[in-house]
């Protein structure tokens, strides 16, 4: 979406992607959720002492 609309602000892109996400079924969301869980586990293994500090 960002490549198709290079002048669009990140906040607008996020809103549109969020709206698209809400339209997906649970089955369509599942691969993304599974990948996020996998990546979280990898990150925790590689950086066990990591603490988020904004």
Swiss-Prot record:
GO molecular-function terms, A-Z: DNA binding
One GO location term (cellular component): nucleus
Keyword Nucleus: yes
Keywords: DNA-binding, Nucleus
SUPFAM superfamilies named in the record: HMG-box (SSF47095)
DNA-binding region positions on the chain: 1-54
Subcellular locations according to the entry: Nucleus
UniProt-listed Gene3D superfamilies: High mobility group box domain
Main location: nucleus
InterPro entries hit by this protein: HMG_box_dom, HMG_box_dom_sf, SRY-related_HMG-box_TF-like
PROSITE patterns recorded: HMG_BOX_2 (PS50118)
Pfam family, one: HMG_box
Example of a GO biological process term: developmental process
PANTHER family assigned: SOX TRANSCRIPTION FACTOR, TRANSCRIPTION FACTOR SOX-2
Name of the protein: SRY-related protein CH3
Species this chain originates from: Gallus gallus
Lineage of origin: Eukaryota, Metazoa, Chordata, Craniata, Vertebrata
């Amino acid at each position: 979406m960002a490549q198709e609309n290079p002048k669009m602000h990140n906040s607008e892109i996020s809103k549109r992607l969020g709206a698209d996400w809400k339209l997906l079924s649970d089955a369509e969301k599942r691969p993304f959720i599974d990948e996020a869980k996998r990546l979280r586990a990898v990150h925790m293994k590689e950086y066990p002492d990591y603490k988020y500090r904004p």
